[in-house]
């Protein structure tokens, strides 16, 4: 004869086997909260994505109702769960040397500058973009101390931790030349075969920190020669996009460059920036 499960285990089993309900009201509240905290606009067709990502948080916390989860969040505005909430709903699509036409532009710009060349990757995700910037600058300017620096930020603390670790599958580095792979990465052996790690010499030139682009001021060591803010504005509404772009203005050095994603058009949003090349912008008063 099988003995009955304790009540707590029965509840947990039900959570695992039954689909929790996400009401219209709770979905709308989630959309409001992520907009307030991160500026991210969630359309109705993102509902399944929201459900699938947040239901993991509920199960981790032993909750069986979205209303209870939202009440827990709103009861403590300083709760660490807010960061987990943001991390769950941010999208991180990236690759080494994504939108490859930007990197020769960066290299040529760096060659013409004097002093330490400083770049900010404003949506660093898991590190592929800032390390691509670092490789480009190392190939162009060398590795002498004080010659260049990459500052990398993201709102998602989990992806920043992966970026700091600098470990990737080797098949993710197909866009690198064999020389770059050998010069800037160490290959894993034994149980780590198929993985690579960024060499410390390169990693030392990249600094990671959490930054929320919704903040009125950015705690970043500007001004910069170049800012990469690619494929992140698409998640914000027009007013938020305009506010972010205007905050970039004092963070660019004279004749500095702002790089956008392939589907983003910054010159249509604010007068402060004008197109210089394919999704490359400069301050309008400096337009050639």
Predicted regions located by residue number:
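A short glycine-rich, Lys/Arg-flanked "PGG" loop and its adjoining helix->strand segment in the class I
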Residues: 242-254
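Class I S-adenosyl-L-methionine
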Residues: 263-288
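Conserved beta-strand signature within the Rossmann-like core of class I S-adenosyl-L-methionine
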Residues: 254-262
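Conserved AdoMet
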Residues: 2-120, 261
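Conserved SAM-binding loop of SAM-dependent methyltransferases across substrates and taxa
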Residues: 126-143
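Extended basic-aromatic, gly/pro-enriched interface segments that bind polyanionic ligands
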Residues: 146-228, 232-240, 265-267, 285-287
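Residue-level signal for inorganic ion chemistry
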Residues: 106, 227, 252
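Conserved class I S-adenosyl-L-methionine
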Residues: 116-129, 149-151
């Amino acid at each position: 004869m099988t003995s009955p499960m304790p009540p707590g285990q029965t509840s947990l089993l039900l959570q695992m086997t039954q689909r929790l309900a996400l009401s219209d009201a709770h979905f709308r509240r989630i959309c409001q909260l992520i907009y307030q905290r991160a500026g991210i606009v969630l359309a109705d067709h993102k509902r399944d994505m929201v459900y699938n990502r947040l239901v993991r948080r509920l199960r981790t916390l032993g909750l069986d109702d979205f209303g209870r989860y939202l009440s827990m969040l709103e009861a403590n505005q300083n709760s660490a769960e807010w960061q987990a909430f943001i991390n769950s709903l941010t999208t991180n699509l990236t690759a080494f040397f994504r939108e490859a036409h930007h990197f020769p532009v960066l290299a040529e710009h760096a060659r013409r500058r004097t002093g330490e060349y400083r770049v900010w990757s404003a949506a660093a995700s898991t590190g592929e973009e800032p390390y691509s910037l670092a490789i480009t600058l190392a190939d162009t300017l060398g590795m002498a101390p004080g010659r260049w620096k990459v500052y990398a930020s993201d709102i998602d603390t989990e992806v920043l931790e992966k970026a700091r670790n600098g470990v990737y599958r080797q098949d993710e580095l197909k866009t690198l030349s064999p020389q770059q792979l050998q010069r800037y990465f160490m290959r894993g052996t034994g149980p780590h075969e198929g993985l690579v790690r960024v060499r410390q010499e390169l990693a030392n030139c990249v600094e990671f920190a959490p930054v929320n682009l919704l903040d009125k001021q950015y705690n970043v060591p500007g001004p910069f020669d170049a800012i990469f803010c690619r494929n992140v504005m698409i998640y914000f509404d027009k007013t938020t996009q305009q506010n972010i772009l205007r905050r970039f203005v004092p963070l660019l050095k004279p004749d500095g460059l702002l790089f956008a994603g392939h589907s983003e058009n910054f010159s249509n949003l604010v007068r402060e920036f004008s197109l210089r090349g394919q999704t490359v912008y400069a301050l309008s008063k400096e337009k050639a």
